[in-house]
Amino acid sequence: LVVPLLAFLVNYIKTVQSKEVDAEGSLNLLNFSVILFSITTIFHMISSFENLLPILGITNFVNVITYGLIGSLVLATISLSYYLIPKLYGREVNYSRLEDITFFGFKISYLLLLINNTVLGVNSGYSWNAGANAGSPTIYGEGYGIVWSLISFNFSVNTFISLLLLGSGFLYLISVLRAISSGSITTVEEMVYSND
């Protein structure tokens, strides 16, 4: 995984450095999805050392990888749909404060989701591992109560992060519907390929 990730990142950085247009609107979200994918790939490489770090295979750390990969796919899809869906109706998105808030909401919620689940995975893994080494399993009984007191706050934070993600999705829906109904009209020349 290291060699493909390095090749991908080098090509991506060269492409970003050589672009002539500033990253505006949905292109900025697409760039963030690439960064999220890269971070998730690094987490995937770390989790492959399961024999060195046994806590990584049984905790929420595995969910970080899933959330990161799905998140990068969702953000890339949202970024492309901001261009494609209004174009199907002959419109385009006029980027405003609503789109900025939507993009910021998606970015911060996925970033917080990754950070919180990483902390949750490491905390629960070490406490479960410590309990097992001490001879008191933490899957049930008093040991479970101790572990739950360590990780319950993170699960509550996950709920609020999910609500932030839901709110960002609702703002995305409003933004796309607004672009379809009252966005700038795209001319036919922009939509049709010409041989000139």
Task: Locate the predicted segments by residue.
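Non-cytosolic membrane-interface motifs at loop->transmembrane helix junctions
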Residues: 22-26, 56-65
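Inter-helical turn/loop segments and adjacent helix faces that build the functional surface
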Residues: 15-21
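Hydrophobic cores of alpha-helical transmembrane segments in multi-pass integral membrane proteins
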Residues: 1-14, 28-51, 62-89, 97-147, ...
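Membrane-interfacial, low-structure loops and terminal tails that flank and connect transmembrane helices
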Residues: 19, 189-195
